[in-house]
Amino acid sequence: MNWLAEKTIKHKGAIIVVFTLMVVFSVFAAPNVSINYQMADYLPEDSKSTVSLNLMNKEFDKSPPNVRIMLEDVSIAEALSYKEKISKIDGVKEINWLDDSVNIQQPLDMIDTDTLNSWYKDNNALFTALVDKGDTLKQTIEDIKEIVGDKGIVAGDAVTENYAKTSTSEEIQKIMLFIIPVIVLILMISTSSWFEPFLFLFTVGISILINSGTNIFLGEISFITNATAAILQLAVSMDYAIFLLHRFSEFREEGLEVKEAIVNAMKKSYTSILSSGLTTILGFLALTLMRFKIGPDLGIVLAKGIVFSLLAVMLLLPVLTIYTYKIIDKTAHRSFMPSFEKFSKIALKIGPIVVIIVAIVVYPSYLAQGKNNFTYGASSMASSEKTQIGKDTKKIDDTFGKSNQIVLIVPADDPVDEKEIGEEINNIEGVTSIISYSNNVGNEIPKDYVPKEQLSDLVSGDYSRMIITISADEESDIAFNAVKEMSELGKKYFGDNYYIAGGSPSAYDIRETVTSDNVITTLGAIIAIGVVIMLTYRSLSIPIILLIAIESSIWINL
């Protein structure tokens, strides 16, 4: 790599121009990268919930409601007025209330209690609405909130997605505002110049910006990738810059001229930087082995980010160092890092004890990490009372009960089995209602006698749709057990010709896919990183020792 070090210094101007052009491109490209907030879109194409969702969108014109709106302390007349106003908002496709189920001109005492309490309870009204989740979603939600004002509370899948969109960018900014000063402080303590930390951050920041801009060539990235890529790239890449400038400082102390010192620093540090970078890249690329496509999405972006970080450190940082070495010299300070000589002696003495302790706790830690509870979708934000949307969701749930809809699609030519499966589903824990042709209309009534608009919600040309409501959070044990039991019943009555969709089925499939992916990605990462370490150190024992130490620390941490 000696030639690269010399060529880099020789073509300083060209390197500055190339990086400047990439930065200019990225400044305009990064804001235009499409962000996907639907976790279910990253399931394998052959997963049951994905196939089911595609079929439902093809066979049925309308999806189930995705917004719940509660109005507090309103009369029937006031509720109808609010419903009328909300229905006129752009993006609101449909809104339902009590008047769509019963004749509200009759006295409330005459209305079935369960039906009444589902829509109007203790002077509180609950609407369900279907809104377009496209580019107008944010404005639609804002318009609804503006109309209902202080009297209203808005929740549901569409609101959760909108919250994810708005909160993600805000949270990234908060994290960056917190972590950058911390990094600067740590770097100031660990370096020998007040200016070096800002040079590090500038170099890595350039690589982060370029990585963000080049994401436009991927078409779209997930909101998880968008939220974590920059922070992870910053955390992982900073070491490369520190390696190089520490070497530079050492050669300057030996009396070498600036250019000679930076060339020697590049030659001496390239091996450690490249081997470290390569192990990181391969670790991230191991995520591409996942069937759950969040893995490849995140892995490719992060691996690409490390490549740009390596290029920035190996090409841009040496050039910037040559241009700014006078500032580095003027802002030089003594090292604030303590001597680790005593620590190293203590570590060597207690090393055998530490090995014994780790050997004792590592297996229980491995078993314990398998018992961790994970969340698999954006709905976890709605179930957390730490967020405003979580508080709003709880308030609606406390008044009208939880409402989690699951769609089961079955062949339309078998009404007897449809009715029987509906009766069995009704006995599943958590199920509060089933809307289907056989259940709400009746198989004895010919389809020709049912209004076309109502019929199309439940029956298409080949399939019948059952909309099942369960009183449980999307990712709760009750919901997952319900999905499992419904799938078993679907297979019992219709073989493989049944389809199940909704938030809970998608989260269930994500959980099953991620669980199976975990073994593959872990093995892939271990093999790839082990090979790199083996080639770097030309040893068989060192990779084994390092990987055992790394995996043990991961299990203990989890």
Regions found by a protein language model. Name each.
Residues 1-35, 132-374, 491-558:
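Membrane-embedded transmembrane helical bundles of large multi-pass transporters/channels
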